[in-house]
Amino acid sequence: MVTGIQITKANDSALINSFWLLDEEKSQARCVCAKSVYSEDQIVPVSDLGQIEYREIPLEIKPEVRVEGGQHLNVNVLRRETLEDAVKHPEKYPQLTIRVSGYAVRFNSLTPEQQRDVIARTFTESL
C-alpha cells in the first residue's frame, strides 16, 4: 500500500516539509516535492531518509501505476500495396483510415513524409 506523507522532523533539514509517497511493500519512497537534494519523482530506499517523523497526507486517488519501457501497438489490417497506391492515387482512397499513436486518422491527411514513415513502420520483413 502507498501512503502519502509530509516530513515534519528529520536529521537532514533539507527533508523538512517535503512530500513523499511511501511504498511499504518495496521499502521505497518516491519524492513528490522537496526543497533540495531530492528531485521530483526520484525513488530512494526508505532507509536513505534516515530518522524522520511525518504526518500522513490523505490520497484522493490511487497512485497511477507507471510502466516504464512499455510499447504501443497500432494494428492496421492493410496490404503494403494498398498504402503505396493511396500515396500515388489519393483520390481513389478518400476514406482510408489508419491508426497512428492510438488515434484514427485519414491516410490522405498525413504529409508525404508521415505516409512514408507509416508504410516503413507498418510493414517489416521479420520481427
Curated annotation (Swiss-Prot):
Residues 5-127 form the Glycine radical domain. Acts as a radical domain for damaged PFL and possibly other radical proteins. The lineage of its organism: Bacteria, Pseudomonadati, Pseudomonadota, Gammaproteobacteria, Enterobacterales. PROSITE patterns: GLY_RADICAL_1 (PS00850), GLY_RADICAL_2 (PS51149). Gene3D superfamilies: 3.20.70.20. Keywords: Organic radical. SUPFAM superfamilies: PFL-like glycyl radical enzymes. NCBIfam families: spare_glycyl. This is Autonomous glycyl radical cofactor.
